[in-house]
From Swiss-Prot:
Catalytic-site annotation from UniProt: 174, 239, 315
Disulfide bonds: 159-175
Keywords carried by this UniProt record: Disulfide bond, Glycoprotein, Hydrolase, Protease, Secreted, Serine protease, Signal
Lineage: Eukaryota, Metazoa, Chordata, Craniata, Vertebrata
Family from the record: Belongs to the peptidase S1 family.
KW Transmembrane (keyword) present: no
Gene: Prss23
Record EC number: 3.4.21.-
Record's signal peptide: 1-22
Location relative to the cell: Secreted
GO CC annotations, alphabetized: extracellular space; nucleus
Highest taxon of the lineage: Eukaryota
Enzyme class: hydrolase
Residues annotated as glycosylated: 92, 206
Name recorded for this polypeptide: Serine protease 23
Organism field: Mus musculus
Amino acid sequence: MAGIPGLFILLVLLCVFMQVSPYTVPWKPTWPAYRLPVVLPQSTLNLAKADFDAKAKLEVSSSCGPQCHKGTPLPTYEEAKQYLSYETLYANGSRTETRVGIYILSNGEGRARGRDSEATGRSRRKRQIYGYDGRFSIFGKDFLLNYPFSTSVKLSTGCTGTLVAEKHVLTAAHCIHDGKTYVKGTQKLRVGFLKPKYKDGAGGDNSSSSAMPDKMKFQWIRVKRTHVPKGWIKGNANDIGMDYDYALLELKKPHKRQFMKIGVSPPAKQLPGGRIHFSGYDNDRPGNLVYRFCDVKDETYDLLYQQCDAQPGASGSGVYVRMWKRPQQKWERKIIGIFSGHQWVDMNGSPQDFNVAVRITPLKYAQICYWIKGNYLDCREG
């Protein structure tokens, strides 16, 4: 026991050196502070009316894996501006292209991806369930209608989206655009919100408190306009495109639900437990909202590689984590990525499959936030 006082003194000295108290609360995973760039429109061009003849893809596949992405050069300033320029589609079928400028751009902002020639040309059965199916169907209106599950919505094209503002939904670009043209149904795109379905026509704000919901149904709101980055339109799933597989939808009216803010994706090692979470409308469980969580297996600057169980229909789901927000002294969930699709990757000569999420980087945060708020001064905190 004689060594215990000496050990205690050593611990105290270590705490003083690290400027913390030996009696402080356990460490909390904290949202990092970032010096964010600014992405601003510079010019807008009118384009010909859009075509809507692409077949909806509920998943995107790519064979360019982590090493392929990590080994490619950074884009030039002009290339980064090109990728972050964007196309806007309006409800009447008209569209515009907006070119952007980037300010306070650091060396690490964005990567252009090349194709891994050794990983192409393979045809394998896609497997999006890893061992035991770890997904959870969410039942009961007390869960479905409350945060965070209530932020998940269904797109009329078959994908999932997440409420990120009073009138805005974040989803995957491939849910509305195949990289060349718009998906069938995008011109009349709608977003579905789960609501209780009452018997005998009861329900809504004027229904009696004794009315019991029979089951859930979708209530739909039309989309006013969509934004898709040119990095997606000019690329494809085997090139840089997957890095830009995200889109923002603006609704015709507010949805009146609590939404989840977007945030810059921290490094995987800073995520609580190294895990991510997301909920979506997987096609193999029709009508059900399906929740899952899993560990991040690898990462690049733009992508998170994981093996969360998922099926087509979950694409576009917002990937989120819950961390401590120091200025407000509270826990907060934020969307840090968008679930995109599936990849077969050659890892040291053997095939490995992943599900992939697009990370919200500082540049992407600046772009998406500007789409939502329309004022870069409101986008200084990621």
